[in-house]
Amino acid sequence: MSSMILTQFRPFIESISGITDQSNDVFEDAAKAFSMFTRSDVYKALDEIPFSDDAMLPIPPTIYTKPSHDSYYYIDALNRVRRKTYQGPDDVYVPNCSIVELLEPHETLTSYGRLSEAIENRAKDGDSQARIATTYGRIAESQARQIKAPLEKFVLALLVSEAGGSLYDPVLQKYDEIPDLSHNCPLWCFREICRHISGPLPDRAPYLYLSAGVFWLMSPRMTSAIPPLLSDLVNLAILQQTAGLDPSLVKLGVQICLHAAASSSYAWFILKTKSIFPQNTLHSMYESLEGGYCPNLEWLEPRSDYKFMYMGVMPLSTKYARSAPSNDKKARELGEKYGLSSVVSELRKRTKTYVKHDFASVRYIRDAMACTSGIFLVRTPTETVLQEYTQSPEIKVPIPQKDWTGPVGEIRILKDTTSSIARYLYRTWYLAAARMAAQPRTWDPLFQAIMRSQYVTARGGSGAALRESLYAINVSLPDFKGLPVKAATKIFQAAQLANLPFSHTSVAILADTSMGLRNQVQRRPRSIMPLNVPQQQVSAPHTLTADYINYHMNLSTTSGSAVIEKVIPLGVYASSPPNQSINIDISACDASITWDFFLSVIMAAIHEGVASGSIGKPFMGVPASIVNDESVVGVRAARPISGMQNMIQHLSKLYKRGFSYRVNDSFSPGNDFTHMTTTFPSGSTATSTEHTANNSTMMETFLTVWGPEHTDDPDVLRLMKSLTIQRNYVCQGDDGLMIIDGNTAGKVNSETIQKMLELISKYGEEFGWKYDIAYDGTAEYLKLYFIFGCRIPNLSRHPIVGKERANSSAEEPWPAILDQIMGIFFNGVHDGLQWQRWIRYSWALCCAFSRQRTMIGESVGYLQYPMWSFVYWGLPLVKVFGSDPWIFSWYMPTGDLGMYSWISLIRPLMTRWMVANGYATDRCSPVFGNADYRRCFNEIKLYQGYYMAQLPRNPTKSGRAAPREVREQFTQALSDYLMQNPELKSRVLRGRSEWEKYGAGIIHNPPSLFDVPHKWYLGAQEAATATREELAEMDETLMRARRHSYSSFSKLLEAYLLVKWRMCEAREPSVDLRLPLCAGIDPLNSDPFLKMVSVGPMLQSTRKYFAQTLFMAKTVSGLDVNAIDSALLRLRTLGADKKALTAQLLMVGLQESEADALAGKIMLQDVSTVQLARVVNLAVPDTWMSLDFDSMFKHHVKLLPKDGRHLNTDIPPRMGWLRAILRFLGAGMVMTATGVAVDIYLEDIHGGGRALGQRFMTWMRQEGRSA
């Protein structure tokens, strides 16, 4: 496919397709071409694609003719603009309506318009029709804004990268077989729809996404459904090419999107039909099974460590076919209801053809699931609140009033005599609270400071309402006038409250909370309740007790949102026969935890549980107090309570009353109201840990008490008896996974399981929980999917073009978008797209975003990142310096380690290339021989790209002038807040004076609690919006770095480059080559597949693994545990006295005896490679997290040369830490080379081990001096 319009990109296309060398000149020429390309040019290039018939399908004409919006809205009794629900109670998303009648044309782009100002002004004056029109106009605009950048940029990058044709895979020694763009149905649809909408108009783009907002094409065929539809089509078009999705499946996905656009609301239709692909593929696979292999993992004891051992493979046979009940009827009904019967029957027909579990069958599931829409769903804040915060649970068996004692302040105690199942809830929380309060560390001033600091962040926390509630009792707060910080942060709030007594701040516990919104993919939008500082403060005992339960009493996994932070092997184990898994999720969990059942019991349990361990003590700045005790009938007594109990009293008052939610809907003028809700607040520090604790506790009660009492079926009884929450039920928040271990006879009978599940559902109804249970032969946990031990990445949940924009704040200025673009690339790596296609597309995309026009003084200039910046950020080169193409893997690390790795792989080639191209010199360097590398790297902009990549991509706001005394008053207030306990301050002071004696001068700027107030101050500054000057300053800095000429890389990288390796033979595979472990990572996707089988999959929780590599697991927010760790390791490495380590630990708040003991341990302990490498800031790259990098460090990297010892490679006895750095360097090279991970042997250290060690030690001493 040669396009006339794309000819200017030809050299770039050849360089990213591995035909010619990549060079910065070619890259920057292409970047210029990208920036000159107009939107209409993109559509002209699309016109040139000769689409084949199989890419076409009928587009329903109804997507262009939509009714006016006014019949979809009304004004309710409280004078709020509301959405009329036609399709069902949740039909409150953006309606698919015409929009042209609301627009006024743009002054220069006359074909485009935006919501007319006249309408907005009438809306401000309260005119009903105008308020309705404005609401529709704004929310439709918000739906159109949920993208990272204009769609045309993503499309152009696709046209450019795919113009290179098929790619030659040097590992498989053949060209890939992904059909070209002429078979890309979503792209054809994109073109046709845009053509039809623009009709005779000269402009082809249906809408413009600009920093000023969204401008709509003034066409009668334009509707609010077009932007989300186009966004989905572009996503699918890109995925079809870069993941090699099956075009016939993608076509079914396109049909659903077109149906959504033809319906009365795009987002609502998508939400109702999102289960179609998983339901008819993943959840109905293998009804007959004739073969294949699944992993045989053993879950090592204790299970809570989440370590697994690979025991080989297990062949699958007929007896492991899907035994769960069929979902055929349910699936067909859904298809009929939404006019998608043909899609459903086509999918089911295809699913039945897979009777063997292998690479092809799991790829089919992955491809199908990738076809679900990936837009961020949007609805107005008003509707979100009224949908989410009006549900109250139906509790079938409430706790009888007589089972409670009389009041003790705000709580009542549950009597032992109660027959309610609440007694088990009470017992668990009571025990956990008692043990938590009995732990000495709970009372340690540092621990309390960590708790008090964890919510002091640059995020908002309903500050306005907090201030109002305090003004109401005549407490005035310092306003820190003239301070250049963002006031709507909890940092600012903490400073304001730092010196107020609890008797004042406690008033704010009942203050309103403001409103936050999160838009999500394939889920309804959530409202977030940002709690204020006093509210978070009194939630601490609730959080701590829940943490105790989750740490000591159940199998909870904590995890972040990134795939790499979740426990992947758990899903592999749970879904591999003969094990079976049941996915249990609690519907509307926040709404189901209310005072009526849960919170009243939990508050009483904690209040009583902590009583004996906390007598008279204050906690986290909350003093002891006295309450009225009427628990014994007819007797009124005054009862002294501790600080912790005082917190529970205040928290109970809040939970009992409910939260008063202040909704100020920026999309609907005049929709300002306060809503009382009993729903548990999603912004509390307790939310997640609290739900987890209740989830496991209620399951334990079911397995041990309620279940056995409600059945006499011997099989079900035996099954329940064999399950425990310490071994078989993993949960996090409202998400649970029940794992039924296979027995010697094989799988547990599915009818027995069915009976138990029916009991669980019935059980939940007693206390208002609706358990959503899926038992279908697959495991789904924390949005990860597994079948027969193979992970199915859900590509649709990582939309390439989509971005959550929940509020109307402006887009972040360039170059911040580059972080998002690199984020897209790394998502694709974790999701196992086709490695070559993905690297090529990512190069095109990065190039398209690498250049920006800017004002430099009075003149227009251009800022341009060289291609090398992207390499530094982790994008692997394709072919460079005359190398073969595709020799660099996407597992190449970022930063200095990555630079070291790719340079080391082709170092002799680079020298040859430089000399051949006239960069020769008489001086010989240990790294590049007789090449004049300094001149070369400056001329090809390698040095400039390297240094530009390390500069901030957001404007720095901490340089703003502030009145000195106000600034000092502010940091002093933060210091008072943090050091609220004088004992803590004296520890730090003592540490400081010890440091002067034993540590000064060894390392600079050791981390200390005294740094935290200033760090918080900087954080509150950085949260503010950048000014023009700050943007210009950032641009200027980038410009200077680009113009500068350099003489070397960083000191570290220069030292690394002195180390040479010899790559040797491949190892035996770590896992069976027939075993699908991750859909899409298979022999058709050579490099990721060979890495997976040669390095092996990660078989333990990465989070637990890294937690073991830290001396201090937790610290105050504002200090970094890694920084503390590396300071301690540097001290040890530089031969500091143990007393210096003790001083360092005192400065971060440890008590002396603890600091002393830990320092002794650090001096003697054997430290792991991953931990030691921190001394030079080396860390395991994210892309390695799914692989067994630990055994790679241990077994693939050999520090003894292949042919025996050399003087140069010997490590001096006192420099054992060097080994860790060397292992990282060797592993970096192994992982950066494509193909099988080989064994690598140390060959030479230029100048010897001792000299290298000394270079690193010098660097450690100097590091931090500039900071």
From Swiss-Prot:
Q: Per UniProt, which keywords does this protein have? A: Capsid protein, Nucleotide-binding, Nucleotidyltransferase, RNA-directed RNA polymerase, Transferase, Viral RNA replication, Virion
Indicate yes or no for the key word Transport: no
Tell me the Gene Ontology biological-process terms attached to this UniProt entry: viral genome replication
Question: Per UniProt, what is one Pfam family of this protein?
Answer: RdRP_5
The entry's localization annotation reads: Virion
Record carries keyword Nucleotidyltransferase: yes
Q: Which SUPFAM superfamilies match?
A: DNA/RNA polymerases
- EC number annotated for this UniProt entry: 2.7.7.48
A single GO cellular-component term from the record reads: viral nucleocapsid
**GO MF annotation, one:** nucleotide binding
Q: Which residues form the signal peptide?
A: none
Q: What range(s) does the RdRp catalytic domain occupy?
A: 555-792
Q: Which reaction does it catalyse?
A: RNA(n) + a ribonucleoside 5'-triphosphate = RNA(n+1) + diphosphate
* Protein task: RNA-directed RNA polymerase that is involved in transcription and genome replication. Following infection, it catalyzes the synthesis of fully conservative plus strands. After core assembly, which consists in recruitment of one capped plus-strand for each genomic segments and polymerase complexes, the polymerase switches mode and catalyzes the synthesis of complementary minus-strands.
- Family to which this protein belongs: Belongs to the reoviridae RNA-directed RNA polymerase family.
The entry's protein name is RNA-directed RNA polymerase lambda-3
Originating organism = Reovirus type 1 (strain Lang) (T1L)
- Lineage, top ranks: Viruses, Riboviria, Orthornavirae, Duplornaviricota, Resentoviricetes
